[in-house]
Design a protein with these regions (language model features):
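Short alpha-helical DNA-recognition segment
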Residues: 56-76
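A short, Lys/Arg-rich alpha-helix, primarily the initiator
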Residues: 21-57
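Helix-turn-helix repeat elements of alpha-solenoid scaffolds
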Residues: 124-138, 165-186, 214-226, 255
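Tandem amphipathic alpha-helical repeat scaffolds
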Residues: 115-126, 152-167, 199-215, 243-254
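Flexible helix-coil transition and linker loops at the boundaries of alpha-helical arrays
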Residues: 105-106, 140-150, 181-197, 230-238
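Short, charged recognition helix plus adjacent turn
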Residues: 36, 105-131
Length: 255
């Protein structure tokens, strides 16, 4: 019941996040700016790479974009009336276990500034949590209608900042809410049937950690092993697996 409540609460915010993403990357008044034309050109090149890899691996497009992009937004991109953000394209490639380090991308100034703001928050979480909290709150205030990927980031940071003070139940609910930002399918059982990026698996690791704090050791270990074995089952590239190993090892030590 508690899990369904958390899922329902998260789903009520999904439409506004989807709308935020659509409004961000669709031409205003039907006329792209010069910057948008450059981003769109880069995006279509990435979309072809993404589509070719997806077809090689026999993955349905709807499966990969579920929870990240609406059908309407996907249709808009295919028609050439909008474009992938770098974050979105990278997220979807990561769901296939494919690195994106090999490709250069053109990103908008706004997206670059957004990335820098998040990087600043990450650098402060461990060494200066109070300052990280201040920057996180400022970021959330500046982005009232953020995308599902941005919300996933914020909730994971929130969990880390509350780890020492919040109750295990609060941490569990927070971690579940983070997962539900982008994962719409059932995920507390077998993960092998889902297409998940490292960012999503990190959130599931936080759920596992929270379950351990709640004394639900068996459930915690089950979920942990699902995440630990996921890259191998999905045939991830070695360097992709390295993006997840340190976090998984840390949670494993806590359990």
């Amino acid at each position: 019941k508690e899990k369904n409540k958390i899922k329902a609460q998260t789903e009520t915010q999904t439409e506004s996040r989807a709308e935020a993403q659509e409004n961000e990357y669709v031409w205003k008044n039907g006329h792209p700016t010069e910057e948008e034309v450059l981003c769109q050109s880069s995006c279509m090149g990435f979309f072809r790479l993404f589509n070719n890899l997806r077809k090689q691996r026999g993955i349905k497009l709807e499966q990969l974009v579920n929870g990240v992009m609406t059908r309407r937004m996907l249709s808009t991109i295919i028609k050439g009336d909008g474009y992938f953000s770098r974050e979105c394209w990278e997220f979807l490639m990561h769901r296939m276990g494919a690195l994106t380090d090999y490709f250069e991308a053109i990103v908008s100034r706004k997206e670059l500034e957004d990335w820098r703001e998040r990087e600043d928050i990450c650098l402060l979480v461990c060494e200066s949590p109070k300052e990280a909290r201040t920057k996180l709150e400022a970021y959330e205030k500046a982005h009232p209608k953020m995308t599902s990927m941005a919300k996933l980031f914020c909730l994971k940071i929130e969990w880390l900042l509350k780890k020492e003070t919040a109750s295990p139940q609060v941490l569990y609910e927070l971690a579940c809410e983070a997962v539900y930002c982008t994962v719409k399918e059932e995920w507390q059982g077998q993960l092998s049937g889902l297409w998940l990026a490292p960012a999503e698996l990190e959130a599931i690791l936080l759920v596992s950690w929270s379950l351990g704090l709640l004394g639900e050791t068996e459930k915690a270990l089950f979920l942990f092993h699902q995440v630990w074995n996921y890259p191998k089952k999905k045939g991830w590239e070695d360097r992709m697996t390295q993006l997840l190993c340190p976090q998984a090892a840390l949670v494993g030590m806590q359990l």
